[in-house]
Amino acid sequence: MQLQINIASHPLIQHWSGILKNDNNPGTILRTACSELGKWITYEIMREWLVTETIELKANTTISLISSHYKYIIVIIMPYGFILAEGARSLLPTANIVLVNYNDIINNVPDQLNSFTKILVLDLFLDEATITPLLNDFIKKGAVLSNIKIACLECGTSQLNQLGQIWSKLEIYTTKVNTNVDKEKCSREDDFKDKFFV
């Protein structure tokens, strides 16, 4: 495994991660925690990822704005990735949204991507079986792997090992790498689904 794994350490990420670990919290609080984590993990990604350009105004004044030459796409792995997206979209309000239900693309990715396309994939728990087909589709359409970032709350080492064998340069942002997750079921979605949708 040679993936670039980034364990987000922002104080607010640590706070909301702590809230999420308390299963005694009601679903509304857990959902809020996920939304906030989606926002702050996205913030950590954007710090090094966004491309800005300098605009000259009158009176020798310049301002820095997000470059209009780049196109941003947020890929939401349904149904739980949507909870992360609630926070992430506030930071990238002009990004195109693509909804993915497991391996079936609901709202298709544009047919042509290029080096000016930046893609953020959001999922609650990393699932190699979903990510690999998506990456294959993105690369086939012209995307550059270095412009693709994965954001999730948790990922298992077995999933990371599988991804690392194919996508050694892939960059993943998460709050936790779980070494105890079962290889056949590396998701804890069942632990949350009844609480999120009440």
Swiss-Prot record:
Record's protein name: Uracil phosphoribosyltransferase homolog
Please, which domain of life does this record's source organism belong to?
Eukaryota
Subcellular location per UniProt equals: Plastid, Chloroplast
Q: Which organism is it from?
A: Pyropia yezoensis
Q: Give the matching Gene3D superfamilies.
A: 3.40.50.2020
**Any single Pfam family the record assigns to this protein:** UPRTase
InterPro entries in the cross-refs: PRibTrfase_dom (IPR000836), PRTase-like (IPR029057)
Recorded family membership: Belongs to the UPRTase family.
Keywords from the named record: Chloroplast, Plastid
Q: Name one GO cellular component term.
A: chloroplast
